[in-house]
Amino acid sequence: MLIKDIIKDPLEIINQYKEIPNPQIPLPNEIYLPQRQNAKGYDIENETTRLKMINLFNNIDENYKVSSIINGIETKDQFKNVYNPANLDQLLGQVAFASDTSINQSLDFASKFFPQWKNFELNERVKIINKFAQLLEDNDEKLLKICVLEAGKTIKDSIDDLREAIDFCYYYSSEAIRLFSEPNNLKGPTGEKNNLFMKVKASFFL
């Protein structure tokens, strides 16, 4: 190394880089790796991010129509108007809450296709769950807007709820791999070999 390099102004060196991440500190979306991904964060203290969030509500003329989907088909349940709780004159859209008939129908289909799902390749099941998480992230602005306007949540609470939903997907898909991939070897007091196998048990209604 030359003397001129040693005596160079440290600020001059630093300013040559756009950013200098510490390789020993994982980035926010990598803090749970290699086990799983982390949900995307939002720095609402940052002016650019804050203004972007505020601008979401400058265009709120969308009209949503939401119903349950059972076996790929929208239900025919009765629609009800949904209003902004902060402005009861503002119609946000219509929602068809699942009737007892729709609930029973969904359980029937879940039971019917359970054997097929049970024998579905584990990695393919994990891909489906992670794909759902990715769709939540891809549609974050629309979902955050709905949380605020339809449920009356703050932007911060809406972000937390969305990130929690995404993290649930990533967490349980990683747990599925951990629990279902290999048997859990249980130690026996007399030296025998005991293997605990995790299996899909049944469909459930949430």
Regions found by a protein language model. Give the residues of each.
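Extended, amphipathic, non-transmembrane alpha-helical segments
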Residues: E137-L143
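Short, hydrophobic secondary-structure boundary micro-motifs
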Residues: L144-I146, S181-E182
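Secondary-structure edge/capping motif, primarily at the C-terminal ends of alpha-helices
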Residues: F114-W117, E150
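Flexible, substrate/cofactor-facing loop regions flanked by secondary structure
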Residues: Q116-N119, K156
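Flexible, acidic loop-helix segments that line cofactor/substrate-binding pockets
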Residues: I31-L33, K145-R163
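Terminal low-complexity tails and localization/encapsulation signals of metabolic enzymes
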Residues: M1-Q105, K112, N119, N123-L135, ...
